[in-house]
Regions:
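Disulfide-bonded cysteines in secreted/extracellular proteins and peptides
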Residues: 40, 142, 162-165
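Cysteine-centered iron-sulfur cluster-binding motifs in ferredoxin-type domains/subunits
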Residues: 27, 56, 156-167
């Protein structure tokens, strides 16, 4: 999940669904640091939306990043309320994350392509200046899905340039 080196992308990694509630708890406890929460779309539907409602209700300035890849990647690519299919593969109502986030009262919401690092970075830097809840939805299908895998070519390691990061 990007916690350990070489990425070191997070300070805390708890359990699936805890990020938004833990970040909100830090704010409510008086921590002066800005708190970020990172959560996948499926986990957001299962447990994260309740915590985000508390963030909105209490006006906490948590920045939540919802990684929308339209599937439950972490546990085996099961369908979820945002995929448009049931677990049995039957058509279902597709929950619109952005509409749901706005409906619970979050006003600062943006959807960006997950691989557009510049857009993500500039958005987060801009949002550090505001004192309100915000949600960034990163949008890209899971790379583990068979139809997505076909888009990626095998990579060759240039050994003399390798720094041993294991990525």
């Amino acid at each position: 999940l990007g916690v350990v080196p070489p990425l070191s992308a997070m300070d805390t990694c708890g359990c699936m669904g805890a990020s938004t509630g833990v970040a909100h708890g830090g704010v409510m406890a008086g921590d002066s640091e800005r708190h970020f929460a990172v959560i996948g779309d499926s986990t957001f539907f299962h447990t994260g939306v309740q915590a985000l409602m508390n963030v909105a209700y209490n006006g906490s300035n948590v920045i939540t990043i919802i990684m929308d890849n339209r599937i439950t990647s972490m546990t085996g690519q099961q369908e979820n309320p945002g995929s448009g299919l049931t677990l049995q593969g039957k058509p279902a109502n597709e929950v619109d994350i952005e509409a749901l986030v706005r409906a619970i009262g979050i006003k600062t919401v943006k959807r960006v392509e997950a691989y557009d690092v510049d857009a993500i970075e500039s958005t987060l830097k801009e949002w550090l200046k505001i004192d309100e809840p915000a949600v960034l939805i990163t949008d890209h299908a899971c790379a583990l899905l068979p139809e997505e895998r076909k888009q990626y070519l095998a990579l060759d390691v240039i050994e003399e340039d390798c720094n041993g990061c294991t990525l």
